[in-house]
From Swiss-Prot:
Source organism of this protein record: Aspergillus oryzae (strain ATCC 42149 / RIB 40) (Yellow koji mold)
The family this protein is said to belong to: Belongs to the SPT6 family.
Lineage, broadest ranks: Eukaryota, Fungi, Dikarya, Ascomycota, Pezizomycotina
Main location: nucleus
Record protein name field: Transcription elongation factor spt6
Occurrences of domain SH2 (ranges): 1231-1331
Gene that encodes it: spt6
Amino acid sequence: MSARDLVEGEAMLDDEENEEELADDYDGEGEAHQGAGTANPYDSSEEDDDDDDDEEAARAVREGFIVDEDEELEDRAERRREKRKRRREEREREDEHLDEEDLELIGELNPSLQAPVAAESKFKRLKRGHKDRDLRQPSQGIDDIFNSDEEEEAAGDYGRHGHRRHMHDEMDDFIEEDVFSDEELQREREDLEIARPAKKGMTGLGATDAAGLDENALEDMRAAFGDGNEYLFALEMEDQEEEQEEDEEKHLDLKDVFEPSQLAEKMLTEEDNQIRLLDEPERHQIARKPYRNVVLTEEQFREEAAWISNLMLLKKRIEPELREPFQRSVAKVLEFLVTDDWEVPFIFQHRKDYMIHAVKAPVEGAGEDGDASQYTVRAEKLLNMTDLWDIFDHDLKFKALVEKRNTIQKTYDNLQSLFNVSDSVVEEMLPAAVTMEELQDVQDYIHFQYASQLRDMTLMNSDVNGETHRRKASSKTFFERVRNGKAYGLVRAFGITADAFAQNALKEGRRQYTEDPAERPEEMADGFVDNDFSNASHVIKAAKSLFAEEIVMSPKMRKVIRQAYYMNGAVDCFRTEKGLRRIDEQHPYYEFKYLRNQQLSDIARRPELYLRMLKAEEEGLVEVKVRFENFDQFRQRLYPDIESDNYSEIADGWNRSRRDVLDMALGKLERLINRSVKENIRQECENHVAKECRETFSQRLDQAPYKPKGMVLGTVPRVLALSTGSGVVGREPIHWAYIEEDGRVLENGKFVDLSIGDRDRNIPDGKDVEAFVELVDRRRPDVIGVSGMSPETRRLYKLLAEVVDKKDLRGAPYTDDHDEEISDRLEVIIVNDEVARLYQHSERAKKDHPSFAPLTHYCVALAKYLQSPLKEYASLGRDIVSIQFKPGQQLVTQELLLKQLETALVDMVNLVGVDINEAVTDSSTANLLPYVCGLGPRKAAHLLKIVNMNGGVVNNRVELLGVNAQYPAMGVKVWNNCASFLYIDFENVDPDADPLDNTRVHPEDYDIARKMAADALELDEEDIKAETDENGTGAIVRKLFREEAQDRVNDLILEEYAEQLEKNLNQRKRATLETIRAELQQPYEELRKQYVFLSTDDIFTMLTGETSDTLAEGMVVPISIKRVSDDHIDGKLDCGIDALVPESELTDRYDIPVRALYSPHQTVSAKILFLNRKNFTCNVSLREEQVSRPVSNTQDRLRGEWDERQEQQDRESLQEKTQSGGRTMRVIKHPLFRPFNSTQAEEFLGSQSRGDVVIRPSSKGHDHLAVTWKVADGIFQHIDVLELDKENEFSVGRTLKVGGRYTYSDLDDLIFNHVKAMAKKVDEMMLHEKYQDGTKDATYSWLETYTKANPKRSAYAFCIDPKHAGYFFLCFKAGENARLHSWPVKVIPQGYELQRNPYPDMRALCNGFKLLFTNMQAGKRR
């Protein structure tokens, strides 16, 4: 079967798509098709060997494809029950082989055996146990392994007719949804009763009968031989040992029950436990995992500090006099990170002084003996929080650098010790290499220069290690043959080495001069002829090639080219043939379709543009080329560095040869460096975009909760949130939820009509206005939040604002500056809903409030966003990458983006701090713990677990170390990192409470804080001692708070404190003292900015999904007509914006009535003339003259940056093709019709739901239509519809045919019974338990993991085929050692198609697959 046969009729694919044919056959398909049609009678006459093979094959798949993902314990119990059942049936079959005469004969020969036959049979079965229960079981045919209840139900439709077998074989425990009858369950219970071990002595009942003796004779026997229980103790010990072994078998680890991927997802692996318990910050452990074995020497540590400083100075503008302090600051931060294991937030908060350069300057006019007050301190901040994260990343990169350098050094050391190699190039360039590229250059040089020695060294190592492998015949490379032959003399005759030439090109050190030989190259070559190179021309060619390769492999020369490339690099973009047609002027890629001569500095200013270019290149629409500008000039500048200065014919001859060599080398070097430059630019652009996303995210995090009127910043408001979602106000219900300041949802419900009436016109208020007013008066919210998913939200906002205004609804009263109680009118605000959209359908929402509707969940999230944006963002976890922060964000790898966004969360969480006791009881606060300094998801969960074990309350910070607590929650190092960021509410009544535990002051600075408090209270040492003896160590600070004397700390002169600390303790604490002073006055003051209200543009983008780039004046867009009047037309854009067509812009044809041209529900193209982003309205034109001239989206460009000539040629070429077609644009009156091509249809459906449809013109002519529908995200199917029985050229045919198989009466019939039917089947497939989200490779990986964890089982799963819309892969693996296979599953309106067999639903498809596979295996056996 060919792959092309998988697509039923080419008409299914629209030729506008330029669809590729199914390039690769699905593996296993041909075999399956052949096997499916093969009869399979069981042949009992096969030889024993064949039977064994069949038994092996059966066992490989019998654990197979019908298994549900049950737990391992249930599987084991089920297998035991089924094997017992099989043994019983085996004995019954054996009994059937004996006829009545045989049984009678046995009874006559031994009458005593007639009665106990059944009992002995049972005894033997129990004694045999589970070890040999399968030994004598005949092989069941592999064609029977898939028999199941499901197959019996559906076999009449697509299976073998009337061929049912009553079998209980090993496959029975894999039947989906097994149901056991009451009789079977009763038999299972009886089996379990019988299986109980009995005493092994002869003292039980029936012993007399069994021996055939009377009681007296039995007594005599007992007297002589004992009662049979003398050794019972040994048998009992044996029983106990067996029971103990069974108990040990029953003891299961998590890894025995769950798959490795599940354990990793839940962070329950051994590695996770190690991270959890190791006393080192979690983020440090994870980041440094690859470099655990890299230990830096002191010299390397100093080198690293300089390396990082130089990297950062390239991007920072720092005054020359600050460069040295900057380098010292970087070195100190590196010491804190690496040696002390302090995380970035700790360093930034508690080691600020090392990031500030302070200089004392005397006040003008002050005398030389002036005191300290006559000096001013000028402080320069050298490093910010982002710089600290950069240093952390650079540290990891340097460790990778050192690891690679050590590997290369070890290789070179071995070469030295074994072959006495000494190479100045390696010894000079290896220590000097500062990038991975430069190290790779050295490595390439070694492998080129010493290839044969390295081969010998590998063989020697393998001999030492005892490895035996076949030695390959020694085959020297071309360059080795030259180097080891005579021809190498000609290479040396060039008069300069590759390294010396590279040194000249680098302009480093003393110039190296070139020496000319006494003979011409051709003459000298004659003397080097040998067996390898038979004439002079061959010798010259070989010598030039080797010398050119030596230049290419020279690390110095590569450095020259690389530096020059970055200085002179330019980027060009060329459209491909595919891009010529696909990228029209409305396409987002048109911005760079003809872009040329982009300097690397231009790329740096717009990194997302370069990433989009590379994305378009991946899609085959453009080709991105990075080139070396003015490369010929660069080449000319290098010639003198390799040529000799002599003037003679001989010198000219040699210089020509040298230039030839250089040309060869530069050609190779240009190609080599080009690849790395292109990739490096991509990495830099990705890093830049990710950091831009981090900056934007930081701004969104840096906002306090909405501040109620009259309250201090940081107060959590009570919120009433309302939304209609994407519904129409007045038509769909308005969902609402009221949330208290503690985050509890106290009430929720729905309103329908909140419109305000008009007394003058006797129009009453809406029926829900009174209920709304009553709710507000009863709950007294601080703010009303509104949001939604369409411009209708603006109407809801205005409606609520009007109700608040007319009914004079006010918030909670508060006391103003004049001690008067006042209340302000409630504020209605539009809330950012980016978190709420993700929350409403999430599993977390269903868990938090199972009974709420999705839109109520949405309202809850809106309210909580107003209460704490930080908590809501933190609750998203990895889903945070779903939020759009910057253009081009989706072009950055998720891991890189997530890492950057996580650092922003870490920064803000540690700025705000976490109430540890609140985190124990409140899940939203607990979501912040993983971002606390020193912690992570594993350590945070462990911390909560230990706190709960210790009673559920933390009384002071030192309790976390286990002081006065049963269990320690963390080690000292982690505690030092996180202590100041976990605060404990201070209560005066608790004598053990330390007020400083409620501040940002670190425990290491508590003594300084207490000294400052004592000095502020003017207490002497005796007063301090008396106070602390009576009330504990926190007494002084408690007294400061109790007497409300915090303002006195402002009188302290902190400069003197700082000088004393630095002088006596060598600690720089000036900035820390400022922090302590601030905390003593207002503990954990809210440092975030005020809540940020959305701007007009933000609201417009949130409610429409459009930005200034995607929707602007001058663009041509489709509009749906709502009403047609003689003087205007009302319409709507796809994004929900109201469109008005004024009379002057209706048409160019005034001879035809407007109503004859346009009708309601018709979709037409229109040009935007005016866009009102605040009111969500626009004026548009339908005139052909306007629509045909959209505003070009190309920017003003410098000369030479845009290829106008190519653009004009392409435009003319496309116009010729359009004119040769001679067709006018077709318009159909249907709400789903759009005047799109295939690309536009895909872009339009990209943001729509699965199963949404666009009807559009077809390029095949007026008797065809194209229907595009969304199969899944990024996957669209284009269906070609053939129209028959048409009234005229522009009408829709009365009969519509799809693929030559399906016929429909009209478009609605086709949409409902064809497209929507297939969409339902796609949904059914993707909701099935066997469906795997992800790629085919990911599904294969899952199958590999599953079968490794369950070696005797087989498994199968479905996944989507992204290359062929409407198809899925059925991937399967028949056991651990079997090959992976996949079969194509086609979605059809009536169900699914597998191997040309139709199946109505997923149940039938699964059973059909099992039958097909069984038949295929049977066919193989035959």
